[in-house]
Amino acid sequence: GGVLFVDEAYSLARGGEKDFGKESIDTLVKNMEEHKDNLILILAGYKQEMCWFLETNPGLRSRFPIQVDFPDYTIAELQEIAELMLSQRQYCFNEEARLEMESLFLEILHKSREYSGNARLVRNIIEKSIRQQAMRLVEQDQVSRNDLLTITRNDILLASQN
């Protein structure tokens, strides 16, 4: 018994006949039946791919009667996540950087509504910005404590290009 969480579950069905994806799906279905009283199986992934995945095996959709759709984060929520991630690492944005992040989120979400509004996007930008900040500070002769803690607009611009 227990709980099994499978993220990006649709990837099990992508490989075709020569990999073990189909066998994995068949095993999951079999175990769901054999342990229906003490096994919770949670499948996660992007909505469109999950719909496709549930059609790849007869009866798979009916075995998952409860489906929960989590909407993408809003620009304000992405901004809040970015601020939180930075503060957890003991960094902060200056005001220009904060505005640039908001502009960047708007641009990314405008280009591709699908898959953009998630925390992974924010984490990647934050991590790249911190690396850009470090590369910028290495070039300076004098570095203040504030310099060490502050992410600038230019750090974000360079991070978003890589």
Predicted regions mapped to residue ranges:
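C-terminal functional regions that serve as terminal interaction/effector modules
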Residues: 1-2, 70
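Conserved C-terminal "switch" segment of AAA+ ATPases
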Residues: 49-56, 61-62, 70-115, 134-141
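Canonical AAA+ ATPase core
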Residues: 10-17, 25-71, 76, 88-89, ...
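C-terminal helical "lid" of AAA+/P-loop NTPase domains
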Residues: 117-139
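Hydrophobic positions in the central parallel beta-sheet of the AAA+
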Residues: 4-5, 41
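C-terminal engagement/docking regions of AAA+ P-loop ATPases
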Residues: 132-162
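Conserved Walker B
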Residues: 2, 8-10
